């Protein structure tokens, strides 16, 4: 309920501000694109920065399958089914935008005693790794749909072809690694370097490179980064509210939200065959949308009209279904045996988002 409130309340305030000020056409402003890119950068870096690498290695096959095959499968199930139902290829893009599991919301349920430590570790890594994958997919899906519909391409960062952007991400990762190698013994310098990398990623839109850098650029800024990610979530929800003055598409939003949750059920069960039944059920019902889905919808709105009108109610639908489904599941389930295992990815003011300052 708290996670849902962090979405609904700022969005409601944003909507009230938009009505009071008569704000409109914000998505066409260069400042709008800059702000949404900053929010995306903070969210992605926070996602991978918080992954507990030692625990993720234990189930790396399941995690890799979830964030590659799983994300592609979920995006295809959602996008293709709705594109056919509504006869609109834009749903191929929207399917990608909601295909990830929100890491902040997932962290809030990791304390569930009915989930085993292994399932918690898988969910934490899954929800963190799938964010950069969906960002990458959304960029390419948006380009394909924009070309098919004759919509101008969204100009961000390095520009040029997507091959150029891929090359820019590779260079970014190389620079990040060299910086880590030279600065790993200087914590304060490493913290400044991390901020510089975020700024560079915003400038050149090298979000995949930034997400990879979060796996090894890990200065002692856990508390500050946690606050920044929470602020980015609230800021993104507020901006979402600012753009809701033109109304929402309730029917399409219901369909998108239901399809996103159904896709997680299908993929979650398919990829966790070796886990106990209780863990499989919790992972299958783990779909929640939050910061990444909101920010992707903000970016896509600058290119396609009507994106937020569909995605905003879809996010609400997904999170309400999650709340109801997991409440019913927990009433029937019994607590899993306790084990003294450090929990991966803890969101919140006092969370430890990073456990290592260097890769192993």
Where are these regions (language model features)?
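Transmembrane helical cores of multi-pass secondary ion antiporters/exchangers
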Residues: 1-359
